[in-house]
């Protein structure tokens, strides 16, 4: 409701200020006065200060988010994702290890379904992560040549 009230107030304010601006133009003042120049400088300084404050706040919040994400336990995790295989745009199979047990899960947008509990654990090579990081995928995409050079 307030937004609509404010939106109706702006055109009325603009219509009131138009005759005032026209009256100033008829006085014949060719050069701006010192007060107008200092007012413009003050407005510019306020604009730059506000913009700097908002940008600083964005950087501070980004730094805090990184610190909070790193604070979580990293070492001895009980639940780990071992492998993931996409089946479609939103469906995938995920192999999860919970303690000593490995479970194959089916993930859809609305459900997580346990499909199979493996009796013998699957051993994956240690050097390769289950899902590549974003940076690795980006490098792979950048190194691909779209023209198909041999």
Curated annotation (Swiss-Prot):
InterPro entries in the cross-refs: Flagellar_biosynth_FliO, FliO/MopB
Keywords: Bacterial flagellum, Cell membrane, Chemotaxis, Flagellar rotation, Membrane, Transmembrane, Transmembrane helix
Membrane topology summary: Multi-pass membrane protein
GO CC entries: bacterial-type flagellum basal body; plasma membrane
Protein's cellular compartments: Cell membrane; Bacterial flagellum basal body
Main location (coarse class): membrane
A Pfam family that the UniProt record links to this protein: FliO
TM regions (residue ranges): 5-25, 45-65
Membership in a protein family: Belongs to the FliO/MopB family.
Described purpose of this protein according to its UniProt entry: Involved in flagellar biosynthesis and adherence. May have a role in assisting the proper localization of the various flagellar components and in the localization and assembly of the adhesin on the bacterial surface.
The protein's name: Flagellar protein FliO
Lineage: Bacteria, Pseudomonadati, Pseudomonadota, Gammaproteobacteria, Pseudomonadales
Recorded name of the encoding gene: fliO
